[in-house]
């Protein structure tokens, strides 16, 4: 018989840097998950992407075991990295803080494709460009 699912936990954790401190510890502790075991597995799986924020969905089962799925970094984080910025604009409609090229948007869209609900790459690019606009980043080309 399959294990009964107790719940799901969604977190965004820096790659290779999961530790028992908040927000990881309290979120997992509430469901009774072995926090150190999760941290070891997550850090081992995401070591190659150091420095990026990685969304993770943790499935917790009734016997306190767990599985997790890592997703691609958020589009906003990827756009900031491509534009070499620390943060987006506080007033995106007035203050533009950086620019990215259409090729950079295409690269981000291809990377994000598995997590986006887009039919094709053009739709994915439009989503990424919308995110860029809402952050005050101009898309050239």
Swiss-Prot record:
Gene Ontology MF annotations: large ribosomal subunit rRNA binding; structural constituent of ribosome
GO terms under cellular component: cytosolic large ribosomal subunit
Biological process terms in GO annotation: translation
Keyword Ribosomal protein: yes
Family the UniProt entry places it in: Belongs to the universal ribosomal protein uL11 family.
Gene transcribed to yield this protein: rplK
SUPFAM superfamilies per UniProt: Ribosomal L11/L12e N-terminal domain, Ribosomal protein L11, C-terminal domain
Summary of subunit composition and partner proteins: Part of the ribosomal stalk of the 50S ribosomal subunit. Interacts with L10 and the large rRNA to form the base of the stalk. L10 forms an elongated spine to which L12 dimers bind in a sequential fashion forming a multimeric L10(L12)X complex.
Identification of the protein by name: Large ribosomal subunit protein uL11
InterPro entries: Ribosomal_uL11, Ribosomal_uL11_bac-typ, Ribosomal_uL11_C, Ribosomal_uL11_C_sf, Ribosomal_uL11_N, Ribosomal_uL11_N_sf
Function statement: Forms part of the ribosomal stalk which helps the ribosome interact with GTP-bound translation factors.
Taxonomic source organism: Pelodictyon phaeoclathratiforme (strain DSM 5477 / BU-1)
Annotated signal sequence range: none
Post-translational modification: One or more lysine residues are methylated.
Keywords (A to Z) from UniProt: Methylation, Ribonucleoprotein, Ribosomal protein, RNA-binding, rRNA-binding
């Amino acid at each position: 018989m399959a294990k009964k699912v107790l719940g799901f936990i969604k977190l965004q954790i820096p790659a290779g840097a999961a530790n028992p401190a908040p927000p990881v510890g309290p979120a997992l502790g509430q469901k009774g998950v072995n926090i150190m075991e999760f941290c070891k597995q997550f850090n081992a799986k995401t070591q190659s992407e150091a420095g990026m924020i990685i969304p993770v969905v943790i499935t917790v089962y009734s016997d306190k075991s767990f599985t997790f799925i890592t997703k691609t970094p958020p589009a906003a984080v990827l756009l900031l990295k491509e534009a070499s910025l620390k943060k987006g604009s506080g007033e995106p409609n007035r203050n533009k803080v950086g620019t990215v090229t259409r090729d950079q948007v295409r690269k981000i869209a291809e990377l994000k494709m598995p997590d986006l609900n887009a039919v094709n790459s053009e739709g994915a690019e439009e989503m990424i460009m919308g995110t860029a606009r809402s952050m005050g980043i101009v898309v050239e080309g």
